[in-house]
């Protein structure tokens, strides 16, 4: 999950997936490095770059923001080397509210595409375009399995 490892994949002539949710940075520089270094091989005749990102869709933006609170609170706590889970949305929201002036919060909020189905789909399309990705992998997040499944259904159904 770096431009260097992406270039290595390109030199090997294989496909490449850039995991934004691990690297905590946009995939564009890595997909560009991959494409620039790509050499055809027995595996691939042409480059194929994918980006893996986090998304959460709900019926409304407000509901999606509410459902994203545990993920975001956990990510912010993780930046302080505090590994913790937030058992309720309310506890997570309280944690975020108490840290609303934390200068790292905007970066945490930007790590995932969160909103209504139409907003998330537009965000995913924009991400693919900006990154030069042939394909996106969506890591569905949410406080329950049902929430994650519903999110993917909403994204697919738009």
Residue ranges and their predicted role:
Residues 2-6, 24, 61, 117, ...:
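Residues at or immediately preceding the N-termini of alpha-helices
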Residues 2-25, 30-31:
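A conserved active-site cap/scaffold subdomain adjacent to cofactor or substrate pockets
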Residues 14-19, 47-54, 134-139:
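Hydrophobic faces of well-ordered beta-strands that scaffold small-molecule active sites
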Residues 21-22, 139-147:
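Glycine-rich, proline-tolerant flexible connector loops at the mouths of alpha/beta enzymes
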Residues 26-132:
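An alpha-helical appendage that flanks or caps ligand/catalytic pockets
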Residues 29-37, 145-158:
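C-terminal helical cap(s) of enzyme catalytic domains, especially alpha/beta-barrels
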């Amino acid at each position: 999950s770096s431009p260097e490892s992406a270039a290595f994949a390109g030199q090997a002539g294989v496909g490449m997936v850039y995991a934004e949710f691990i690297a905590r940075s946009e995939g564009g520089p890595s997909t560009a490095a991959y494409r620039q270094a790509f050499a055809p091989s027995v595996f691939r005749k042409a480059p194929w770059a994918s980006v893996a990102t986090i998304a959460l869709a709900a019926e409304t933006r407000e509901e999606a923001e509410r459902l994203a609170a545990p993920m975001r609170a956990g990510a912010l706590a993780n930046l302080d080397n505090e590994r913790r889970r937030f058992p309720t949305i309310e506890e997570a929201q309280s944690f975020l509210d108490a840290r609303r002036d934390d200068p790292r919060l905007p970066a945490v909020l930007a790590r995932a595409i969160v909103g209504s189905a139409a907003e998330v789909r537009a965000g995913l399309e924009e991400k693919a375009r900006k990154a030069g990705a042939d394909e996106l992998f969506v890591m569905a997040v949410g406080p329950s399995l049902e929430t994650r499944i519903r999110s993917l259904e909403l994204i697919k159904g738009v």
